[in-house]
C-alpha cells in the first residue's frame, strides 16, 4: 500500500467515525440487527480477552486499541509498524508487527495503564508488501503467523506460507505453503482442522482468479501459489510445466478480487442453531476491478455431512453502486454471542446481534 493511500484511508476512517453511518443500508437476514459498538481508527484484526475486552489492531494507524465490554476505547500501544495482528492467550495480548511479535502481560488487570509491549520474536521478514500479519492461537497453544508473498506473483523462499511459533522454544515452523496472502484463519470447532482465506493475485482480469477458502486437514500441504490459482487456473508465467492437480484445491472458491480477510466459525449461542459452526468471512472489497465487488460479510454453510453447501451474502450494503462507505476486515464472537465486525475505512467496530420477532 502506498503512503498516500494509507493516509487517505486513515483520514477517511476518522471522518467517517465522526459522522453517523448509514446503517439502514445494511441488509441482514430477518431478526438480525447491526449497530456501531465503538469507534476505533483504522480498525483491523480483532481478539477477545478473558474479561470481554476486545483488542483491535491497525495497519496504517500504528496503534493497538482495547474496547471495554461497555464500549469505552483505550489506546494500549502506539508507534508500532503496521500492528495489524492481535491475539489473546493466558492473560497476555500478543501483537504482530511487520517483522516482530511482542507481548503485553496481564493486560486486562489495568487496561487504563498498560505495560510497554515486550518483543518475544523478531526474526520475521521486514518487507511491507503483504507484510502486515494476522495472528491467532491454535487449540494446542501455538501462535500461527502467515508470511505473505512480497509481490503480486513471484516465487520466493520463506514467503507465501502459514507457520507457527512455539512460545517456549521460540522456534518457527512452516505448516502450509503455496499461500499468496492470508489475513484470516480459524480452526474447526469439532475437527480442529485449520481453515484460512487467501487473496488471489491481480492483473488476470476482472473475473480471475477467485479468492479462496482453504482447508488444511494436515500440515505439509501446498495450495498452489504462484503456480496455480483457484485450483484449476495455471499462472501464465509461473504455471508453465506445472499441473494444478499437484496442489491442494480450495474448499470453496470465493468471489474474484473480493479481498477475503478475517474468518470465524460461529460458536456463539445468540444466533439461530443453523449458524452454529458455519463460517463468516469479512470481504474487504476489490481495488482494481472495473466493477467493484466484495465489501460485505459472507457466510459459508455446511451440510450435515460436513461438506460445503453454499456461499452467500450475510451482511451487505457497504457498497452502493460503485461507492463504498465501509470495508469489513475481521470478525470476533463476543461473550453474549453477538458478532463484532471491524471496518478500517469507517473506523468502527460493528456489533451484529439477533433477536427473534424483530
Model regions: which residues?
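Short loop/turn segments immediately following the C-termini of beta-strands
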Residues: 58-60, 98-100, 106, 148-150, ...
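Surface loop/turn motifs at the tips and blade-to-blade linkers of beta-strand repeat domains
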Residues: 35-41, 74-79, 120-127, 174-178, ...
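Asp-box/WD-like beta-propeller blade repeats and closely related beta-sheet repeat scaffolds
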Residues: 82, 99-138, 146-151, 171, ...
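Beta-strand-rich domains and repeat architectures in extracellular enzymes and scaffolds
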Residues: 35-60, 258-265, 281-282
Amino acid at each position: 500500500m502506498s503512503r498516500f493511500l494509507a493516509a487517505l484511508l486513515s483520514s477517511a476512517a476518522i471522518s467517517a467515525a465522526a459522522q453517523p453511518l448509514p446503517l439502514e443500508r445494511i441488509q441482514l437476514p430477518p431478526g438480525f440487527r447491526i449497530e456501531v459498538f465503538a469507534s476505533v481508527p483504522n480498525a483491523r484484526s480483532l481478539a477477545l480477552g478473558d474479561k470481554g475486552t476486545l483488542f483491535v489492531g491497525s495497519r496504517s494507524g500504528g496503534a493497538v486499541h482495547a474496547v471495554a465490554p461497555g464500549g469505552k476505547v483505550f489506546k494500549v500501544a502506539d508507534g508500532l509498524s503496521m500492528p495489524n495482528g492481535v491475539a489473546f492467550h493466558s492473560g497476555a495480548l500478543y501483537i504482530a508487527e511487520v517483522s516482530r511479535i511482542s507481548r503485553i502481560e496481564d493486560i486486562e488487570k489495568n487496561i487504563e495503564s498498560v505495560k510497554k509491549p515486550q518483543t518475544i520474536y523478531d526474526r520475521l521478514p521486514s518487507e511491507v508488501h503483504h507484510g502486515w500479519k494476522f495472528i491467532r492461537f491454535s487449540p494446542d497453544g501455538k501462535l500461527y503467523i502467515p508470511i505473505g508473498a512480497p509481490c503480486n506473483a513471484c516465487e520466493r523462499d520463506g514467503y507465501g506460507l502459514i507457520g507457527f511459533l512455539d512460545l517456549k522454544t521460540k522456534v518457527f515452523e512452516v505448516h502450509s505453503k503455496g499461500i499468496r496472502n492470508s489475513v484470516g484463519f480459524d480452526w474447526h470447532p469439532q475437527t480442529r482442522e485449520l481453515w484460512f482465506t487467501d487473496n488471489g493475485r491481480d492483473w488476470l482480469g476482472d473475473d480471475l482468479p477467485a479468492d479462496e477458502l482453504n482447508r488444511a486437514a494436515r500440515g505439509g500441504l501446498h495450495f498452489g501459489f504462484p503456480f496455480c490459482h483457484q485450483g484449476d487456473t495455471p499462472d501464465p508465467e509461473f504455471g508453465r510445466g506445472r499441473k494444478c492437480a499437484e496442489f491442494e484445491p480450495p474448499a470453496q472458491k470465493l468471489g474474484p478480487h473480493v479481498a477475503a480477510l478475517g474468518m470465524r466459525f460461529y460458536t456463539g449461542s445468540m444466533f439461530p442453531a443453523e449458524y452454529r459452526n458455519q463460517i463468516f468471512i469479512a470481504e474487504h472489497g476489490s481495488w482494481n476491478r472495473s466493477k467493484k465487488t466484495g465489501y460485505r460479510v459472507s457466510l459459508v454453510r455446511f451440510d450435515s455431512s460436513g461438506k460445503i453447501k453454499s456461499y452467500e451474502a450475510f451482511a451487505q450494503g457497504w457498497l452502493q453502486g460503485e461507492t463504498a462507505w465501509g470495508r469489513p476486515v475481521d470478525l470476533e464472537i463476543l461473550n453474549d454471542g453477538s458478532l463484532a465486525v471491524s471496518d478500517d475505512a469507517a473506523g468502527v467496530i460493528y456489533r451484529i446481534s439477533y433477536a427473534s420477532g424483530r
